[in-house]
Amino acid sequence: MYERDYGNMLHLVSGVYIPFDIKWKNIGVSVSGGADSAMLAYVLCKLITENDANTTVHIISHIRMWERRPWQRKNSLDVYDWLVGHFTNITFKRHENFISPDLEWGSQGATLIDEYGNINSGDIIEIQSFAKYIAHRENQDINYNAVSHNPSTLEIDNRFLRRDIVFDDSEKTRNLIIRKHGDRYSCHPFRFEEKKWIISCYKLFDALDLLDVTRSCEGDNIDYPDVFKGLDYKSYKDDMRVPTCGKCFWCRERDWALTCD
């Protein structure tokens, strides 16, 4: 049914359907600086190039946890610069948003009601709202997000349970991949793909140099002072080499994916 409803815009990429209409003039992609969002942006740029589409790519990045992890802005800029340098045929625009640490899920939890009537955290509402604003301002046809599925063969504490849902071709799960909001689409094409598939794409497309630019670690001096040794917004400089903790969910997920065939 998924193929029936969106068949005219589906492109098979390493066994996974990626919705993209070559007639679209403006697309938005959330890019954090991590491996998942960087690969999604890469795949979309690849489709634009292969189909000679006249599509502007709007990269949306959020400054988050700026006091604890000030390097995250540099991570997203590094990915953006890589994309611009490698896809010189494409017009890019970057849009940067700021999210107060006080609104993050880790600070307050899910305490607010979003526009769809769901209980959500402030950061999620802010991300959705900013994407909607940019989509309207830039007349975007679709906005993409690279949220992926939890590892199926790795037990990790603090996993996000909403990433465990299984695709069953119901309307509910199809809507988690792509759905229409008014005149525009919202799309999570990696929603049911694990990070091992995403890492395999880096190998398949010979884009390991892009993977090297990305950062998955969500650790910082508060949680792992033995690793970060006091590093925060007061001492961080953009030319610093920032360590990875190797212990957080995101580090362990990435390490697991890199060892998968």
What are these regions (language model features)?
Residues 2-261:
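Nucleotide-activated chemistry modules centered on ATP-dependent adenylation/adenylyltransferase
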